[in-house]
From Swiss-Prot:
It comes from Lysinibacillus sphaericus (strain C3-41). The lineage of its organism: Bacteria, Bacillati, Bacillota, Bacilli, Bacillales. This is 3-dehydroquinate synthase. PANTHER family: 3-DEHYDROQUINATE SYNTHASE (PTHR43622), 3-DEHYDROQUINATE SYNTHASE, CHLOROPLASTIC (PTHR43622:SF7). Its main location: cytoplasm. Pfam families: DHQ_synthase (PF01761), DHQS_C (PF24621).
């Protein structure tokens, strides 16, 4: 399966398949045959689990750079080490870099590619469900202790290869985390799709064909939005549904303690509560959605681990904040997102409602 992504700066495709890595890479033969060197950035966990398959199916010689797993790779230190590695290996503007791993590896690799010699080509080979989202659209970044993804660039890959073979060995928590972004895509685009997900016995056990179709839907939603707004000036903000409150939880906990998708799910419920005040959504739906999330194993304990005051400083660092006012992505109804300025007083009121709802549902 192919999903085209057409932005103002670059056109490319997302290739989806199962056990097709060699075939997919050969799609880029015209570009790759002109390259002088190949570099693969990955993390220790991915390389141990999937390195043999990758080496057996990657048709070129390459040098590998091993990163720590998860958000630990998105630091100044790892960014600097990656640049040093490329310089020492005599990487040139004719070289190609491959991001082989989850969303964090893709974010770091993309930012390295965007800034090394002012830009070298790279291809995303995501290995997690979560990365179906982050690998598409050209957002690259590293973290700062004061905020997630605060240092980065918009830089599109030459392509994205999603081989569902990698999902076969994902831990349950990683599947759950990635599926949260799929659910988010359904919420901003298609009420029937969300109803289908909420009616499923579980969103944790798709077979390979079902997973590929779900990923294709999610990628199509993102591709359409990114084509209209590459640098997040307008509709691309809709993709941040659940991320304002979710990022605050994630940052307060310390990156990696609460999985990104877990934090997004926490944020999605918060946005539903806030949306009740400005659209057609109501408390019974919000409660049903929370129960659906709990049934699928999403943890919400982190909400009660921090006071609203502890979350405030992280909320105010959200990249959508304008002139000191928080901008939340809300839903008029499922499939119809919008952005609204919300003051801290109202945020605190909704935070209190959230804690009350959790006390009711998590009994």
């Amino acid at each position: 399966m192919r999903v085209p992504v057409a932005t103002k700066s670059h056109h490319y495709e997302v290739l989806l398949g199962h056990r097709f890595l060699t075939e997919a890479i050969q799609t880029y033969a015209d570009q790759l045959n002109k390259a002088d060197k190949f570099f693969v950035f990955t993390d220790a966990h991915v390389w141990e689990a999937q390195g043999d398959y990758f080496k057996a199916n990657f048709p070129y010689d390459f040098e590998v750079f091993i990163l720590p797993g998860g958000e630990a790779c998105k630091t100044f230190e790892q960014y600097y080490a990656a640049q040093t590695f490329l310089l020492e290996q005599k990487c040139s503007r004719k070289s190609f870099v491959f991001a082989f791993g989850g969303g964090a590896v893709g974010d770091l690799t993309g930012f390295v590619a965007a800034t090394y010699m002012r830009g070298i080509p790279f291809i995303q080979i995501p290995t997690t469900i979560l990365a179906h989202d982050s690998a598409v659209g050209g957002k690259t970044a590293i973290n700062h202790p004061l905020g997630k993804n605060m240092i980065g660039a918009f830089y599109q890959p030459e392509g994205v290869i999603y081989d569902t073979v990698f999902s076969e060995t994902l831990p349950v928590r990683e599947i759950r985390s990635g599926t949260a972004e799929l659910i988010k895509h359904a919420m901003i685009s298609d009420s029937a799709w969300l109803e289908e997900l909420m009616a499923a016995d579980s969103v944790m056990h798709f077979n390979q064909q079902e997973l590929a179709m779900q990923l294709k839907k999610g990628i199509e939603v993102k591709a359409k939005i990114v084509a209209e707004d590459e640098t997040e000036q307008s509709v691309r903000k809709f993709l941040n549904l659940g991320h304002t409150y979710g990022h605050a939880i994630e940052a307060a906990a310390g990156y990696g303690k609460v999985a990104h998708g877990e934090a997004v799910m926490i944020g999605l419920v918060y946005c539903l509560l806030l949306s009740e005040r400005y659209g057609e959504l109501n408390r019974p739906f919000t409660k049903a959605f929370l129960q659906f999330a709990v049934k699928n194993g999403y943890p919400f304990e982190a909400v009660n681990d921090y006071t609203f005051e502890q979350l405030t400083s992280y909320l105010m660092k959200d990249k959508k904040t304008e002139y000191g006012i928080l901008q939340f992505v809300l839903l008029e109804k499922i499939g119809k997102p919008f952005v609204r300025a919300i003051d801290l007083k109202e945020c605190k009121e909704v935070d209190a409602e959230y804690r009350e709802l959790l006390a009711e549902v998590l009994v």
